[in-house]
A protein has these predicted regions:
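Proline-aspartate-enriched helix->loop->beta-strand connector
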Residues: 186-205, 210
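C-terminal and late-domain segments of enzyme folds
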Residues: 286-314
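N-terminal Sec-pathway targeting helices
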Residues: 1-16
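Short Gly/Thr/Asp-enriched flexible loops that form oxyanion-binding sites at enzyme active sites
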Residues: 209-221
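A conserved mid-domain beta-alpha-beta active-site/ligand-binding segment of alpha/beta enzyme cores
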Residues: 244-288
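Active-site environment of divalent metal-dependent phosphoester hydrolases
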Residues: 60-63, 89-91, 203-210, 240
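Short, flexible loop segments at boundaries between secondary-structure elements
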Residues: 224-247
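Active-site rim/loop-helix segments in enzyme catalytic domains that contact anionic ligands
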Residues: 6-9, 20-193, 218-232, 262-264, ...
């Protein structure tokens, strides 16, 4: 009888341990590195194919898809990169650049122009010329508001104190900050360039600009006569990428919570030359490297591969 109780206690402990490990994996961890070999390679677009990379901030394109961009350009594809915002709502970097504890609206706008210049330099390293870049200039940290509350009424940026795009190089000059304008502009861009493939941030990304960027893109695709393929990449998620920091000999694997039997994940393997170019491109974003926390996050994407989740057709 005593042995039976001990056995039951041991079994109970093992069950609890298993469930704890499983829950930890689902919430925080990524797949083990051997799982990378089970993820199929994404086809790299070539001659006659058009790829749009649509992201909320300058640096997201290199973090999530820098290698894919470089390989697609080298393979002959027509690649365009579209930035929804100028990343002008980052207080820490604006404080650093302006040397002011309380930056003024014009300091945030100057920061936005700085992010644009960094993006041009970064993408040039990957082989993308400046005329293949579109800056839409919508409000940083405001995409959720545009999608949910300010679809028709202009949104006032708490950083730049503007409710319209005041940048000289906006895609839609002086466009009021409304979700409707952003949606219409995206639809026009997609219609104009007729992409075969769109890459954008993941709808489950924990940064609201990233998740709502995915929503705006998905809605814009729905109105398009042709339906391009849509790949998502993740930037912000629980303990992703794991581990943080520079680990160029490690692989990037999907977060456990984003894995299900119906998901189709793809990878792009990066050789040493492509990885070096991605590293050089990322280093152009010195405004972001000023923050040790951001630097650690960004360097975590310098791995031997990139990963994408293929969107399901609506």
């Amino acid at each position: 009888m005593k042995n039976k109780k001990i056995l039951l206690l041991i079994l109970g402990f093992l069950v609890i341990l298993f469930l704890t490990i499983f829950a930890y994996f689902r919430i925080y961890q990524t797949l083990p590195k051997f799982a990378v070999s089970l993820i199929p390679e994404a086809e790299i677009p070539g001659q006659g194919k058009t790829v749009l990379v649509i992201v909320p901030h300058e640096d997201d394109e290199v973090l999530g898809a820098g290698g894919f961009i470089e390989k697609s350009i080298k393979n002959g594809a027509n690649v365009m990169v579209i930035f929804l915002t100028n990343g002008d709502g980052h207080k820490f970097t604006t404080q650093e650049e302006s040397r002011k504890l309380y930056p003024k609206p014009e300091n945030y706008i100057e920061s936005g122009y700085q992010r644009q210049q960094e993006a041009k330099k970064a993408l040039a390293i990957l082989g993308l010329p400046e005329n293949k870049i579109i800056f839409m200039g919508y409000p940083d940290n405001g995409l959720k508001n545009l999608f949910e509350e300010n679809f028709s009424e202009p949104y006032l940026s708490p950083y730049t104190k503007q409710n319209y795009c005041s940048y000289s190089n906006c895609y839609h000059k002086e466009a009021p900050y409304t979700g409707e304008n952003l949606q219409n502009d995206l639809e026009q861009i997609i219609k104009t360039y007729s992409p075969d493939l769109i890459l954008t941030t993941h709808p489950s990304d924990t940064h609201s600009d990233h998740s709502y960027c995915a929503d705006f893109v998905a809605n814009a695709i729905e109105t398009n006569p042709t339906q391009p393929e849509l790949y998502y990449f993740i930037i912000h998620f629980n303990r992703f990428p794991y581990p943080k920091g520079l680990h160029i000999n490690r692989y990037l694997t999907p977060p456990g919570r984003l894995i299900s039997s119906s998901d189709e994940w793809l990878k792009t393997s990066l050789d040493s030359d492509t990885l070096e170019l991605k590293k050089q491109a990322l280093e152009q974003y010195q405004s972001q490297f000023a923050s040790p926390m951001l630097k650690s996050l960004m360097e975590g994407f310098l791995r031997k591969n990139e990963i994408f989740s293929k969107a399901k057709k609506r």
